[in-house]
């Protein structure tokens, strides 16, 4: 996120509007979509040091440092916990063609597994409406990846729900 730069000063407001309503306008045209926004962040110092002097959202550009903006995005992936790409991560064997994965992910957008939460868990009153929507959507998306046939267990839902609450 640190490398994001806005030439158009309305960019952050457009993103906030989209994250709140699922639509945004440019000129006379209104555009609707159903994708969530997830950001990947990296930090240039240790987590311990950053937390003592600032916060984990500090890498965001100044234009985005806004509680309304932070309340609206669905996840912040801690990039500092993701290993950097190395040659041993690649193979000369068979692999997954990304086109197939993209088509599968597009097809799975037709389904929601958010009701899986209600089968075993109850979200508390500490979540506001935006948080509840984000947690339900993130849990649903994760379940689509780990249990694509819709046959999930209480434990798989719990793991996805805990991750969704953390992000």
Where are the predicted features?
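Structural recognition of the conserved hydrophobic beta-strand(s) that form the central parallel beta-sheet
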Residues: 1, 30-53, 75-78
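Hydrophobic/aromatic-lined pockets within catalytic cores
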Residues: 16-24, 81, 147
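Conserved AAA+/SF3 P-loop NTPase catalytic/coupling segment centered on the Walker-B
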Residues: 1-18, 42-52, 68-69
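Long, highly charged low-complexity segments enriched in Glu/Asp and Lys/Arg with interspersed Ser/Thr
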Residues: 160-167
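Conserved AAA+ ATPase small/helical "lid" subdomain
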Residues: 36, 72-160
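Hydrophobic alpha-helical bundle architecture
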Residues: 4-14, 25, 54-61, 123-127
